[in-house]
Amino acid sequence: MASNPNFNEKTSALDVAHHYASQARNKTVLITGVSRYGIGEGIARAFAHGGASTVIVTGRDDTRLSLVVKDLTTDYPSVKFHPHKLDLTSLEATRRSANEVLEDDTVPKIDFVVANAGGAFLGPRQLTPDGLESTFAINHLGHFLFVASLLPKLRLAAKTSAPGDTRVIVISSTALHISPFRFADYNFDGNVVPEDEAPNWAPIKEIFGFEEHEGYSAWIAYGQSKTANVLFAVHWNTLFSHEGIFAFALHPGGVKTRATDEVSDMMAKEQKAKLPDPFEKTIDQGAATALVAALDRELTPEKGVFLNDCQVTDVPPYADSKDKAQKLWKLSENLVAEKLGSALQLA
């Protein structure tokens, strides 16, 4: 449980930031996937509201970044907002982007990283320039490389902060219930998937009407990527919690954004009615759980790494298994080394 049991699905991120202002004040935050009218903007706005001194906002489009920075600066003129280009579809571009952050002397340390970018990419299977299934590449592997590369600046923050005050927050989803991580066929190349990695077809059939089938499914791809987000947090804590850098994953809720409007528009009325978490939260409400995960000192990895509606909650055993988390971390390291020709250095 979070330290405030009254926080719930209706809680405002601005209220959370005000409640934990002592934790946000004068801190440096980096948030991926920030654009106008999205959850990332809501998270950035809340950190600024709580008194953060520097907020780095990343995205693929320079024009969109400049627009959101203009909006945020107008409302919070005392906060330094840094736009930073990040394209998670390319591992080389991701590495280059991370190195630019590391080389930026105006940002000596980073207290919080919020891995918010990504989404569900409906339609047929798509591959990135690295030959990876796009949902896995963007939602997990790109963030794995980017966040892990920022470890030196997270460590600098941790050295001058109380243990656990430096954190990595990963935006996951309750869609993790759709599928475990498919180690046997994470890229949807057609390999046989063992029973313990098979998807849960029941909610897919109930909501979307899809019968069980072989081959690619955008929803299964999304589900396994959200499971990967939690496993990333689990193994991050194994590696770095002793250094005072914690990681948590969370479900922001069904948030009404432009992106979810596009998904909603593709669904029939009957399908929308069956959604366990319809797109009814405001952006401010959707950002609230990320603020709790970042700022509540009562949270520790031992109490749980996944939050929903501002409270710690359980996930299926396959999503917080330390063995599976370690296995995914190793797979991710190997893929980065294979695609980039050099290993990720974390020592």
List where the protein language model places each region.
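Rossmann-fold NAD(P)H-dependent dehydrogenase/reductase core
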Residues: F7-K256, D261, L346
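C-terminal tail/cap regions
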Residues: L299-A347
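Short coil/turn segments at secondary-structure junctions
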Residues: D130, S134, Y216, I220, ...
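Pocket-edge positions in alpha/beta enzyme catalytic cores
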Residues: V57, L86, P278, P317-D320
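Short, hydrophobic alpha-helical segments
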Residues: L154, A294-E298, V336
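Alpha-helical packing segments of well-folded alpha/beta enzyme cores
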Residues: V68, A228, F232, G286-A290, ...
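C-terminal helical subdomain
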Residues: S225, A273-V312, K322-K324
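Alpha-helical membrane-targeting segments
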Residues: M1-T11, K256, T260-T282
